[in-house]
Swiss-Prot record:
Source organism (scientific name): Heterocapsa triquetra
Any GO molecular function: oxidoreductase activity
Residues annotated to bind chlorophyll a B1: 698
Gene3D superfamilies named among the record's database cross-references: Photosystem I PsaA/PsaB
Protein name as it appears in the record: Photosystem I P700 chlorophyll a apoprotein A2
């Protein structure tokens, strides 16, 4: 039963819709509380338990996969249909990739002019939308050379989407019934089933009882896979990651690397095909132990991607650094990486005990000491599993965001400045939102799923130990946040003050010497000094990290140190708020007995005082703003650093990043100029639409403050006035039906949610327009 049982408020719980019929005509406060509170109680909300929940989650994956396949197919289809891929690969640096065309009967000459500049540089004759996703670079990297091949890929993706939908539908309808029938000695079917096909299937199966029971064991294994952690881990590690990575290494070796050397695996309309043999000796060197053979004869320095000029024959290398012409990682290095990952993960898939006892490790045996019992606890809490999964995927996404620019994997991606920043921005937002979700569901787990076993001491339960030490955890985070905040902001304000009074020479400038030493350990030279490391200075890696072009290890100074500590401040405050909210979800100094009051994730309901302000939801809500601002500081820093590098004005960042007004003036205001001038009464340009989005997103962002600051009293007065005017206007009074909808003030939770959504959406889209306008 949910801790937020609706009977507290006189409502009935619902299982088939977000808003039950009884509540649909009630106050917004009750409706929102009921939904936000009870939707997290998965079992009672949907009326399913145990393995059926796992099965439903598994089945939802098929739908998710189908959506992904269709989404990718749609993007690729439009590239093939009205993109310029075949033109782009002839000159990837100077040609802008087209995502899709635009046909609008309302476009006049002025409307065409808005997109005209883009079309002229993209090779298109119509109005188009430019692609900032990097998908062209990915297609080029993996060996696509024609629109025909893209169309074939689209068809494959669409077939996979259909297959995923059919698999999900089939399992959803028949799986439970078949399991129940196969597990008994007599035919089983639901009495009164309205599905005649299912009933007839059962009757048919009942006639063949001696045949079908042989399928019991595969079905039981199928169901066990959802609940057996070892089996599930082995499958995900080995089959999904291991074999997929190994297969991708095969594609790179047989298709992508030969294509990068002008040897194409083509599929023509008449059916002719050539399959590139990557090595003259095939697998003989592998079995004979001469693995170094595959790394011999690497591409020459004058190699041109996609041609035979300077091409080598190596297929698996460990060169490091980036190619000189594409400014991207060597495909042979990437193939080696995926081969190693595949082998490693397939081996790791045999670590955990699954079907046979005595073979592999049992996770429950590994989790000893303070971690004992964690496996059972995690298996019984979907919110704990989801929190851990979100945290893990968040870290992976963040790492991808960092690598996508510092070690660009796709050819010529580093030359496309807007795409480079857009991909970093994209992955930063996703990673941040996933981490917020991790903390939110950790709070729900502590409220709803965690129980203290009175028979065990606190030391035997890692979660209990964390809760017991939460005062120390919170106070340490608070101390770090205070230290970072006062010192960082103090230095910024000092520098602003002395600069404003005409004495910039008195600024406090602190060199990040420890970070510079770490850079030198990776091969970076320090102000013309000799290398600290023993790495061969002629290696590709050392050449890459000391290039002026690229962003692997950029020179850093006092402005970088201040930005680093400002970002650290934001990260620590965000974590402080989230940790305090999660750890205090069951009880705090202010209200130690929350858990005994039916206290939930959002709050304990309307009409019980200001308890929403001390709930885990409120901490999540507050931390979201710190997350958004911290992410903004991170991206501001990254973007400005990259802009000055690309424009060869690195001195601007070095001088202006040491005080706050420098950030406002030389980064935000200066780079907003192109959008501010996007359109006027005299005409428009190719940034006009982005300028309009810049304005509209600002308005959305500002609307969020109206909800966040005004709170309940303002809305109560406003709605009363609106309702009064409606009732005093005869025509509107006829339209208005108070029995269908009753306007009431927004609750605190509701107003904060609406305000947060406006703030976040406006914030993110405003900066997206800023990126395109300033970087273009």
């Amino acid at each position: 039963m949910s801790l937020l049982d609706g009977r507290i408020l006189g409502f009935t719980t619902h299982s088939d819709s977000f808003v039950s019929k009884r509540q649909s005509n009630g106050a917004a406060t009750g409706r929102f509380f009921q939904v936000i509170g009870n939707i997290h109680d998965i079992e009672s909300y949907y009326g399913i338990h145990g393995s059926q929940v796992n099965l439903q989650i598994f089945l939802s994956h098929f739908g998710h996969l189908a959506i992904i396949f269709l989404w990718a197919a749609g993007n690729l289809f439009h590239i093939g249909w009205n993109g310029n891929y075949e033109l782009w690969i002839l000159n990837p640096i100077s040609t802008m990739p087209i995502a899709h065309g635009i046909w609008d009967p309302h476009f006049g000459a002025q409307g065409e002019a808005v997109w005209g500049g883009v079309s002229a540089t993209s090779g298109g004759s119509e109005a188009v939308v430019v692609s900032y996703s990097g998908i062209y670079n990915w297609l080029y990297a993996v060996g696509f050379t024609s629109v025909y091949e893209i169309y074939n890929f689209v068809i494959v993706l669409e077939l996979l989407a259909v297959a995923a939908l059919l698999l999900g539908k089939t399992h959803l309808i028949y799986n439970e019934e078949l399991i129940q029938w196969l597990g008994t000695n007599k035919p089983y079917y639901r009495v009164g089933s309205d599905n005649e096909e299912v009933v007839s299937l059962y009757k048919k199966l009942a006639l063949d009882m001696k045949v079908y029971p042989m399928f019991i064991w595969p079905f039981r294994i199928f169901l066990a896979a959802f609940d057996a952690s070892g089996l599930r881990l082995n499958f995900h590690i080995g089959a999904l990651i291991g074999f997929t990575s190994l297969a991708w290494a095969g594609h790179l070796i047989h298709v992508a690397i030969p294509a990068s050397r002008g040897i194409y695996h083509t599929i023509s309309p008449v059916g002719d095909s050539t399959f590139a043999e990557p090595s003259l000796k095939a697998l003989y060197p592998f079995y004979s132990g001469n693995w170094a053979y595959y790394a011999q004869d690497i591409d020459k320095d004058n190699h041109i991607f996609g041609s035979t000029v300077g091409a080598g024959k190596a297929i698996l290398t460990f060169l490091g650094g980036v190619k000189s012409d594409t400014a991207s990682l060597y495909l042979t290095d990437i193939a080696h990486h995926h081969l190693a990952i595949g082998v490693l993960f397939i081996w790791a898939a045999h670590l955990y005990s699954s079907l046979y006892k005595g073979f592999g490790h049992r996770i429950r045996d590994i989790l000893v000491s303070a971690n004992s019992g964690m496996m059972i606890r995690s298996m019984n809490s979907y919110h704990l599993q989801l929190a851990l999964a979100c945290a893990g995927v968040s870290v992976i996404t963040s790492v991808v965001g960092q690598h996508i620019y510092s070690l660009a994997p796709y050819p010529y991606l580093a030359y496309d400045y807007v795409t480079t920043v857009a991909l970093y921005l994209h992955h930063s937002w996703i990673a941040s939102l996933l981490m917020m979700a991790a903390f939110a569901h950790a709070g729900i787990f502590l409220v709803r799923d965690y129980t203290v076993n009175p028979k065990t001491t606190t030391g035997e339960d890692i979660i209990g130990r964390v809760l017991a030490h939460k005062a120390a955890i919170i106070s340490h985070l608070s101390w770090v946040s205070l230290w970072l905040g006062f010192h960082t902001l103090g230095v910024y304000i000092h520098n602003d003050t002395v600069t404003a009074f005409g004495e910039p020479q008195n600024s406090i400038l602190i060199e990040p010497i420890f970070a510079q030493i770490i850079q030198s350990a990776s091969g970076k030279t320090l102000y013309g000094t000799t290398l600290f490391s023993v790495v061969n200075p002629s290696s590709g890696w050392v050449q890459s990290v000391n290039k002026s072009f690229g962003s692997l290890l950029l020179p850093i100074g006092p402005g970088d140190l201040l930005a680093h500590h400002a970002i650290a401040l934001g990260l620590h405050v965000t974590v402080l708020i989230l940790m305090k909210g999660a750890l205090d979800a069951r009880g705090s100094k202010l209200m130690p007995d929350k858990i005994h009051f039916g206290y939930g994730f959002a709050c304990d309901g309307p009409g019980r005082g200001g308890t929403c302000d001390i709930s885990a939801w409120d901490s999540f809500y507050l931390a979201m703003f710190w997350m958004l601002n911290t992410n903004a500081w991170t991206i501001f820093y990254f973007h400005w650093k990259e802009l000055t590098l690309w424009q060869n004005i690195t001195f601007q960042f070095d001088e202006s990043s040491n005080y706050l007004n420098g950030w406002f003036r030389d980064y935000l205001w200066f780079n907003s100029g192109s959008l501010i001038r996007g359109y006027d009464a005299l005409g428009a340009n190719d940034l006009s639409v982005w300028a309009w989005i810049f304005l509209a997103a600002h308005l959305c962002w500002a609307t969020g403050f109206m909800f966040l600051i005004s709170w309940r009293g303002y809305w109560q007065e406003l709605i009363d006035i609106i309702l009064y005017m409606h009732l005093k206007t005869p025509i509107l009074y006829d339209i208005w039906n108070a029995g269908v909808y009753t306007p009431v003030a927004l609750s605190i939770v509701q107003a904060r949610f609406i305000g947060l959504v406006h703030f976040a959406v406006g914030f993110i889209i405003t900066y997206a327009a800023f990126i395109v306008g300033s970087t273009t």
